[in-house]
Amino acid sequence: MKLNALTLSLLSALALPALASASTANLTVATTTNSRDFPLQADEPLVIPLTKGDYTLTISGIGGDCPPAPEQEIKFNTPIALNCHVPTQLPLSIRFTGDYAFQWQAQNNTLTFVRQTTKAAKTEFRRPIPNVSCEVYQGGEVTLDLASSFADGTELQDAMTGQVVTVEQGKVRLTPSANSGGLVLLEPKQTAKAEPKQPFTYRNANIYFVMVDRFYNADPSNDGSYGRHKDGQEEIGTFHGGDLKGVIAKLDHIQSLGTDAIWLSPIVEQVHGFVGGGEKGSFPFYAYHGYWTRDFTKIDANFGKDEDLQTLVREAHRRGIKILMDAVINHAGYATLADLQQDAVLVVNAPMLPERWNDWKPSADENWHSFHQAIDYQSKNWQQWWGPDWVRAGLPGYPAPGSSDITMNLAGLPDFRTESPQAVTPPQWLLNNPGTRVVSKPNYTVADYLIEWQSDWVRRFGIDGFRIDTVKHVEGEVWQRLKQRATESLAAWRKDNNQSGEPFWMMGEVWGHGAYRSPYFDDGFDALINFDIQKRMDNGAACLSQMAMVYRDYAQTLAKYPDLNPVSYMSSHDTELFFGRFKSLDMQRNAANALLLTPGAIQVYYGDEVAREAGPYADDFHQGTRSDMPWEWNAERQALLKHWQTLGQFRQRHPAIGAGDHREIAQSNAYVFTRTLGEDKVVVAFVGR
């Protein structure tokens, strides 16, 4: 949620006076597809590497009193006035890749931007834990006043410790767990191990996001499919071997977290070869992540076979877990050497390359971008590729990319012409692709094919829902049609397989969208990823009562809009890992408290539950967020995992957590609230740190 001055003044008025947080200055550097934020220290320069391109800078967390900053442009070595209490947003265009310094002068509240003349040493950003006012737990027994929530004689059980207490004279007395981060989770005793009193609702969904390639390799026989290589270095952008069989093998682990749905990164066939990784071309970058599609109708061999997906759906459903596939409709994958050779697209100077083009490696004076020297980007033979009736691309005879969200080439990827009413035929190389299900259909448009290819996964396998990539870059009418077609496909699959369940569910990614209702919900979306909460997690992990305003705001908004469902997260593949911010297992545990008690659905990124470390990333930071899932844990991480399991299962037992009425209970020594949905009622207490 972007905050304006009015919103901030209202939130300030609602905040608990005794728990006002200290100001924490923050710089967010964002592109159209990802972002990263950094702590700003007064009078200490922040040096970060930036590649050529356009960015949006947001400076927030500045306290004090100051006049509103005027409209201004960023100029080198020129102080820029900042707002107090209201974020300052500035466009930034970088012409030359390099290291850049941001100097915040707290005394006069300005930011100065400087290009570093020498390369700065690589810095690990570890934030100081926010200095916020917070309740303090002195140890021993605590007394909680619950007279307004439960009648005398009611037996309650703390999910964290297993203690059973009885409400007497409106109060309960118990000793919190020393390892819970000050958290007490009270539920009626008879429901502590029982089925939920309310049916499942996606507003309480706990969604586990798996990047399939980096999760678990259960079938090494499919590694290196299509002639893909390791690089023998840090393996930043290569396939690591994770597959669908690996997800199946770890379903019990996923279930133990109270998971309701698994969001799989895209598993359809990806481009076979590499492109250069990072601005400097320092590593070969393959489509291990799944967002560079070659064929939308088949599973990539690195990830497995149809039988594996069938088994995964069956075994997940047996555990009460739904399967969400990641659907990409905005763009196709890059033209790599491997694909150009296989598909006989005659735009390459073959004598410059080895017999198998994907075996190419840069020489000592080249980098991984240098393969472009063998490709003729002015050749008329590019018509043999996707073709100008299918995509926008900077190629001869193709429609030029535009500047709008709909017509731009996102990250230089070929942009499907989903708005075109023209009937098209799939390119010949795709019709000839081994194992493809693509067939030419009379009078089909680009959007017709893409909708059919995506919904066919639902019809064949009983997929429960989609996570939709890059929503704002495709027309709303296309999303409405996809939702209708997928809904019909799931109903047909269930009829054929004698099954029932919730209607097809669609979650969208609209970059920067917060926990509010927007017209995107009229385009078939049941939920949107909530980009608002990630930075609020810092203070919430430092002290849970700092989430009071967030919880109150979200719960009120959910009550006002019955079709609204924000999906909140703390880590993602396009931003950062929460653990990387503080490198603190205690903060990771406390962040679980803040996230899993948030109204609305929540998303756990694989490894959040064991504080997964970032991997190597060269000059592309977001590669580090896709590190391999660790499967061996020391005692401290096992304790962290146990905490996530206890909290996740508590949330799963009680749909009131995500979907219920939220009401605070005033206490002198704790932050306490109830969540109620029909007969389902729980009390959450934070007694301090």
Q: Language-model segments: which ranges?
A:
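Substrate-binding/active-site clefts of carbohydrate-active enzymes
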Residues: 199-205, 215-456, 460-461, 482, ...
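Active-site-proximal helices and loops of the catalytic beta/alpha 8
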Residues: 89, 93, 97, 101-182, ...
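Short Pro-Gly-centered beta-turn/loop motif in secreted/extracellular proteins
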Residues: 45-56, 62-63, 123
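Short, surface-exposed beta-strand/beta-hairpin micro-motifs centered on an aromatic residue
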Residues: 43-49, 171-174
